[in-house]
Each structure stands twice: as C-alpha cells, then as structure tokens.
Amino acid sequence: MYIEKLRNFIEDFFLSGPVPANTHIAEYTASLVFLSLLIAAIGAFTGIRLAIIMSRCANPRHRRWLHGAGALAFGAGIWSMHFIGMLSYEMDMKVEYIPSLTFLSFVIAALAAWVVLYISQQKRYGGLRLFSASLLLGIAICGMHYTGMAAMKMDADTYYIPSLFFASIVIAISAGAAAIVIINHLQNYTG
C-alpha cells in the first residue's frame, strides 16, 4: 500500500519519458532576472555584515537581535531572488500564488538563513559539521524553492526532470557550504 502511494507520488512529481510535445516553453524577463540577482546580493551583503557585527558583539541580547535581523535580511534576499525569478518567467497563461504556501516558502528561507548564521558563529567546525549544516541548508533552500513552485496556481501541470531536480539539490548544498565558509572567514578577517 505504501509502496503504491510512493510510486504514485513519484509519477506525479517527476517527468518520466520524453518531454511531451505540448510542453509550455517560456522565456525570462532579463530585467527582472537582473533585479533578482541585485536583491540577492544586497540581502547577502546585509546578512554577512550583520553576522560580522554579531561576532564582535559582547551583549547577548544585542547578539540575538543581530542574529534575527541578519537571518531576516539574508532569508529575504534568498527568497526574493527566487520569487522575482519566478515572476520573470513569462508564460502565456494566468498565474496566481497561494498566499499561505508563498509565506511558508519565505519562512523556510529565513529559518535556513538563521541556521547559516548560527553555524557561522561557531569558532570551530570540522568537515562533518560543515557537511551536516550544508546538507540541512541545501535541503531548506530546495524546500523553499519547491514550496514556492507548489504555490503557483495555473492551468498547467508541473513535472520535474529527475536529473535536474537532483542537480538543484547538489547546487543548493554546495551554495550552503560556500555561504557558511565565506561568512566564517569574513568574520575572522574583517573589522
């Protein structure tokens, strides 16, 4: 029974076989893609800067505020990049977004950013801890992205090509590892 449910879920989620002839191919609006990258850079810069200030702050209460503000800035940058990127995808159909799922995707991004800032504050972490944190962060980023995709209401079905789906997970985990290492190094070498 559970095997059958899992098989049905996989068949409904992943595209099996060749891409159908009636697949909708769309284009991106370049100016919105650029805007999404700019907002992501501003969010990352703000989150990293707040993490650096937090690492030098002696007051625990102020550290908590800086941690929360940094997570919101970083998370908002991540989420905005993805959401604006989705808006830039021009389709010849009406697309709406389910507010609760859209908000949930933002919460996932902010929590992932909170974890990154928490891990980056640790003075020492080995390979296993970095891998675990990167894995958690990558899964959270994918969760944010695919929750945002699930929030789309349109007159079409969405399927994912398995190789690209799993590549997105590997990329998200790698980006998470890079973010943790970069933030940690910047805290050690800037003032």
Over which residues does each language-model region extend?
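Polytopic alpha-helical membrane-helix bundles and their juxtamembrane interface segments
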Residues: Y2-G191
